């Protein structure tokens, strides 16, 4: 039990790993579609760090596209007197933003809807995007306001998911690398013109299907996502020289990333033997099997989803009457988050899953709250044992098992290292979920068979206590690696 890493073989040669997950768009609230990338990526980051690697996580924001021009033009329509829209203004731009987060969240959908029916407005938005991307100072000042207001809100909402990033970079950061990238691809004879666009072939011998060439510049001269993603890789190579890349993105993006990775290696941006892993995840669906929606049929905001779950958990723990009143709200948040994350992470990432809140928050079965309940049970036994034995509560070695349930629990605990290693090498957090559930079940069977606190043989009781203390350590570590925690009471 003294082993700091619980029997894990940490990496002999620590790697520098870039994990790209999150992928939120600036100026838009996080919705349920953002859940999986954040939750899966956070877990892979924690597992990789636990293995001893140097990990850099990057949210890679969408902060440079047409949405910026749409917001600028909608703001122009609403507040035409702002100095940003006065061509004769030469002073400093205000440090206070011209909108709050709730106003900003109203501006974007209004602009997006308007652009679908008003061609002239859309044209203005495209012009504004072009001016911003060409370095026009007034629009750059608005862009900075959009970034500051939006980032504060994004950080809060990711924080509520217990998700954090080392880098808050976006597509805008990659822009300076694009001209050099295009020039290099042309110089090496990799990029050629096709219908006015600039493309790079990515087909390889032995491909089971045909892959279309990767377009790096449109016929109108505009850069695309592929260009921006390649430029980001150049930036990452210069800043970090990564040994491994992991992208946690919707599986529908697979072709895009095959193209980007192949161009990166073909052009020598990334060494041929550097693993570039695309972890494509499936969708979270409603009970009807279709994409998860609000009652009105719209896309549900992530903060509303979390709030709904927390409220349901609050009612549940209120009924049980085991949690002190001042801990109720925080406990509901901790249990609600574990319900949500475990429901997601316990599925293989590539598979779709059905969102069923009543099943997810159950204290029985294969759920996050069930595992938390087992941890809380162990905490309670350990506290009572301390009261019972006082100064005699010494740590003793775990003894050879005397029963099948004791042996099964010991065997389960021994597997922590190999399971964690396998979760890392296969980028498969669901393996850790399965393991954690197996340990919780093994503990429960042991607990039901042995009266730990009323055991009369003091040496035997002390060995039981050592065993469940180790069980708690293993479960707590798994919870942390998956981005969850357990409450004090339930």
Each language-model region and where it sits:
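Short, basic phosphate-binding NTP loop
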Residues: 1-5
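Non-catalytic interaction-recognition regions
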Residues: 6, 11-490
């Amino acid at each position: 039990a003294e082993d700091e890493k619980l029997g894990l073989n940490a990496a002999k040669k620590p790697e520098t790993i870039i994990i790209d997950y999150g992928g939120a768009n600036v100026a838009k609230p996080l919705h349920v579609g953002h859940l999986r990338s954040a939750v899966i990526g956070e877990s892979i980051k924690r597992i990789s760090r636990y293995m001893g690697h140097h990990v850099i996580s990057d949210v890679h924001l969408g902060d440079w596209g047409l949405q910026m021009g749409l917001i600028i033009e909608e703001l122009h329509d609403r507040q035409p007197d702002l100095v940003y829209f006065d061509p004769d203004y030469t002073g400093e731009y205000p440090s206070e933003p011209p909108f709050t987060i709730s106003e900003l969240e109203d501006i974007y959908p209004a602009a997006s809807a308007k652009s679908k029916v008003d061609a002239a407005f859309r044209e203005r938005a495209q012009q504004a995007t072009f001016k911003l991307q060409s370095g026009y100072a007034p629009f750059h000042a608005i862009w900075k306001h959009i970034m500051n207001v939006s980032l504060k809100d994004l950080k809060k909402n990711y924080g509520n998911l217990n998700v954090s990033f080392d880098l808050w970079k976006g597509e805008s950061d990659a822009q300076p690398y694009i001209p050099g990238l295009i020039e290099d691809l042309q110089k090496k004879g990799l990029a050629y013109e096709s219908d006015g666009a600039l493309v790079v072939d990515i087909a390889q011998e032995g491909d089971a299907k045909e892959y279309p060439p990767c377009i790096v510049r449109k016929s109108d001269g505009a850069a695309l996502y592929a260009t921006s993603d390649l430029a980001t890789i150049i930036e990452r190579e210069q800043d970090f020289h990564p040994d491994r890349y992991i992208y946690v993105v919707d599986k529908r993006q697979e072709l895009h990333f095959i193209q980007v990775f192949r161009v990166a290696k073909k052009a020598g941006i990334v060494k041929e033997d550097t693993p570039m892993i695309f972890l494509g995840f499936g969708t979270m669906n409603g009970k009807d099997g279709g994409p998860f929606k609000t009652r009105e049929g719209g896309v549900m905001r992530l903060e509303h989803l979390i709030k709904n779950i927390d409220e349901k958990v609050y009612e549940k723990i209120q009924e049980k009457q085991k949690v002190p009143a001042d801990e109720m709200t925080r406990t509901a948040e901790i249990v609600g988050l574990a319900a949500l994350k475990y429901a997601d992470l316990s599925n293989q990432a590539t598979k779709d899953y059905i969102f069923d809140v009543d099943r997810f928050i159950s204290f029985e079965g294969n759920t996050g709250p069930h595992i938390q309940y087992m941890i809380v049970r162990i905490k309670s036994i350990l506290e009572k044992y301390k009261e019972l034995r006082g100064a005699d509560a010494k740590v003793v070695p775990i003894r050879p098992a005397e029963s099948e349930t004791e042996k099964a629990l010991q065997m389960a605990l021994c597997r922590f290292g190999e399971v964690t290693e396998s979760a890392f090498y296969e980028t498969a957090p669901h393996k850790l979920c399965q393991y954690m559930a197996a340990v919780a079940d093994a503990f429960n069977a042991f607990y039901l068979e042995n009266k730990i606190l009323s055991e009369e043989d003091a040496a035997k009781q002390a060995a039981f206590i050592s065993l469940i203390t180790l069980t708690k350590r293993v479960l707590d570590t798994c919870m942390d690696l998956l981005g969850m925690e357990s409450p004090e009471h339930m």
